[in-house]
Amino acid sequence: MNHLCADDRPNIIFLMTDDQNIRSLGCYGAPGVTTPNIDGLANDGIVFDRHYDTTAICMASRATVMTGLLEYQHGVNFGTGMDGDGQMRNDDWSQSYPMLLQNAGYQTAFAGKFGFTIADGSKSGRYPEDDFDTWGGGGGQTSFITARNKSMERYAQEYPHATRSYGAFGRDFIKESAKHGKPFCLSISFKAPHRPVQPDPLYDEIYAGKTFPKPANFGRKFGEHFSEQSRRGRQYQRFDDWHYNDSYDDVMAKYYQLIYAVDVAVGMIRDAVKDSGIHHKTLIIFTSDNGYFCGAHGYGSKVLPYEESSRVPLIIYDPRSLKKSDRCHSVTANIDIAATILDAALGKPTHKKGKSLLKHYDTSRTQGDRIIPLINVWGPEQAFSLGFVKNQWKYIYWPYTGDGMKPTAEIYNLQEDPLELHNRINDSAVKDIRLELEEDYDNLVLEWQQHAIDRPHYKTATTLFFRKGP
């Protein structure tokens, strides 16, 4: 794609939720869920059915989205710094999509949960509020109460719940930017549906008294074949602690209610684009920073490399494309977001690991043997894992030795077994595939070793992940 003339540059809207299970949207086949605006976006654009977050936890995933770098390259995650959370290096931030677009003349705005800090010589780092033309972001987890989010206080009276306030922020920025005719990039990171469970009371009746079918892999008996290491993180305990086992309908009703408010905000944003007369040149991307187990396999929360945790929604609406209401089945990942935005806005290829998804507008094309890493080096070391997705296969390696455990691996054929019910690691029928995947894994570890950021956490992990077992 050639460099675009300034007048041809599209507006970019990037919308990201927090902890959204792929089965929570109508366009992904969720029964009993009401998401008309997001489904409308899908109907007008392309739905990506095999999109993964390379690290299924918010801080690392958000840094990857912004930069196109894997976690072991950018080093941003909880507790991965020398004396606290890993801060993003200034050199990496300068190459993030918001900074590159601003340097290219885009008007930039951010609202919501930013998720990480930029290194500035202090222990805590800085949030980049001065790096955007308009800022509605916040540190930490932010709050569902708008008045508690300092940069969003002006919306508190009319929109007391934060989710709709972000819709209002987006609406106002879009309308103001459209007046000046300058291309813009608006990024909104919703807190929803992240815990604590505080849905907007305006929508209490949406799912009141409703029941929801459980996925076919729901419950502990469908996770017995998982590694013992996977049960050493807090995800296993949260199946009980968060009441998926005994109050599933109530828990999911509130979860879906949080997402319904996001859908309302998406509607506000799309209406603003249309009302401003810029719908023909405004690209919209919708995704989540990670998935959510919601009781599948007897787990709660996220982090682990299984489908419910690592595979997330991705919808791209590009008015320049003739493709509408189509689906892409190629394997894609959050490392591709920055490359896609920069390609769409500037017509420039990226030097990062990510790939532009513009070519996937032709959904009949296949992508070949691309390998998407799935990384977890957060939480207890017992639950550390490294895996990847390649074509229909997923390979996971659990390196921890001790407490009666030894290194183990899992292989799933996602085409035949999308619910990950059958570990094929000892299946002689896939012996050749196993050898191929093990070689791919070994190369992935070597790549980590060669390109890891110079921080002890990631250097140590390199040694840990060399295969010692099956």
Labelled PLM ranges:
Residues 1-408, 418-439, 443-446, 453-456, ...:
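Formylglycine-dependent sulfatase
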Residues 411-412:
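Short hydrophobic beta-strand that contains or immediately precedes a catalytic carboxylate
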Residues 415:
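Residues forming the ATP-binding cleft of Hanks-type serine/threonine protein kinase domains
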